[in-house]
Amino acid sequence: MSYHEEERHGGNGLDWFEESMSSLLAADVDLAGGGGDAGGGGYAWWWAASPAAQQDDIGSVVAQTLSPPSTAAPAAASPSIASPAASSPSDVPSSSSKKRKSPAHRAPGHTGGKKGGGGKGGGGGSDRDMRWAEQLLNPCAVAVEAGNLSRVQHLFYVLGELESFSGDANHRLAAHGLRALARWLPAAVGPAAAAAVRVPPCSERPTTAFAAAEPRLFRASLIRFHEVSPWFALPNALANAAIAQASTCGAAGATPRPLHVVDLGVSHGVQWPTLLESLTRQPGGRAPPSVRLTVVGPGATATSPVAPFSASPPGYDFSPHLLRYAKSINLDLRISRAATLDDAVPGDDGEALVVCLQFRLGHAAAEERREVLRKARGLNPELVVLSELDSGVGVVGGDGGSAAGEFAARLELLWRFLESTSAAFKGKDVEERRLLEAEAGAILAAADVAAAGEGREGWRERMAAAGFEEAPFGAEAVESARSLLRKYDSGWEMSAPSPAAAAVALRWKGQPVSFCSLWRPAA
């Protein structure tokens, strides 16, 4: 796909991305029926089967795989999956033509989730009995942690037959989960033992790494994701509303002050055009006299690898675009970059300082979280915006939990991402979706650093310990967020703030995804 860039001026907050979007929409072709060879070969029975029959077949494979071995006679092997007991690694299919095809190849009419149809659709279904990938991956994680290599090998064979980065949410989860378990295996059992386990090769072309993508594709993917999914868009909208209010102390008719935003997040500039535009529409038409944006790099925490979605590719720089846009709406904008929060130097006393901590701190180790919050408190900000995943698990090693249990929690969260992106992209296998899903899959990395998140209650305790007190969202901000959510798939919902919980939570089909909360320095 080719992305051509040209400078744009004026218009709304996303005009500076217009070229990316036009290229993206031109390339948005439904590939659901374009993959695979229709010849069928030895697997025509699989392609020709109805979706219900396909699901039943996979269900029987899962049941057979997870059932205890019979003492009387060995169970019959699946028509497609070789029995590890009777097969050597060389017998395992290594070509996509020897694997079960994904639904994108089998069912040209399938479009995944769609607006108004998120209740049971969206790429694989929400019911536990339909989520076969987790039924295979979680026992495999337990086997890896226990060092049960024969069990690991057996499940690797089965997962290798069913995985597909272009299939429905189950097939894609199997693909991401299998690769994550294969990377974890040497650390769990030792390199020598891990070398004896054969990892089925992936026959599909590898997806470009998020931080190594072509800059125009990277930018267009972020924009498209905000257009079709509220995963980041809703927390960003809530943050922007709170920041705009902070610039005037929340008082109607108050004189706007210079605004300084410290961005320790994952928006890569996509969040800010909307904020800049809203600042020019303040009551009385009085925008802040100046706006300063300090972007804190992905190395602000020592976590390795860096938090998903936090790194950008070499050559990607949103600053020139954003500066041109600010100039077109007569806003004085300055952009600087900081390696850590230590370099985010506050400005004048009259400056409204807001620190945005969005989707990065939750991937850091417990001590790093405390240190970053301590530094944020030291800046004495007017407001802190905290947006994080709402998975409700704790740091591994800190609560006695097992690595396999942590893997299961991360797998649950990744399922929600994959199922919701199926709905967002209407089942289409496009490069932008693959790029985003590959980065989201990084959450399955070996669970030896930090958890996927610790839930709202855990963060409330952590913020209070750092010297902050929770602040409520304005009614207008909440209503605007609710209105924004209506443009997305009906599987999305948000829980409004209450006296007991001031944060706004985002949910997919009733299950928690993330929350956005506001904090001020405690008196």
UniProtKB/Swiss-Prot annotation:
Cell inner membrane as UniProt keyword: no
Composition bias type Gly residues, residue spans: 110-125
Subcellular location(s) of the protein: Nucleus
Organism: Oryza sativa subsp. japonica
Region listing for Disordered, in residue ranges: 64-130
Recorded family membership: Belongs to the GRAS family.
Region (Leucine repeat I (LRI)): 131-203
Region (PFYRE): 353-442
GO biological process: hormone biosynthetic process; regulation of DNA-templated transcription; regulation of secondary shoot formation
Taxonomy of the source species: Eukaryota, Viridiplantae, Streptophyta, Embryophyta, Tracheophyta
Biological role: Transcription factor involved in the control of strigolactone biosynthesis in roots through the activation of the beta-carotene isomerase D27, which participates in a pathway leading to biosynthesis of strigolactones.
Compositionally skewed regions (Basic residues) per UniProt: 97-108
Region (Leucine repeat II (LRII)) residue spans: 317-343
Expression tissues: Expressed at low levels in roots.
Every GRAS domain range: 124-520
Region (VHIID), start-end ranges: 222-295
Assigned GO CC terms: nucleus
Motif (VHIID): 259-263
InterPro entries on file: TF_GRAS (IPR005202)
Record's protein name: Protein NODULATION SIGNALING PATHWAY 1
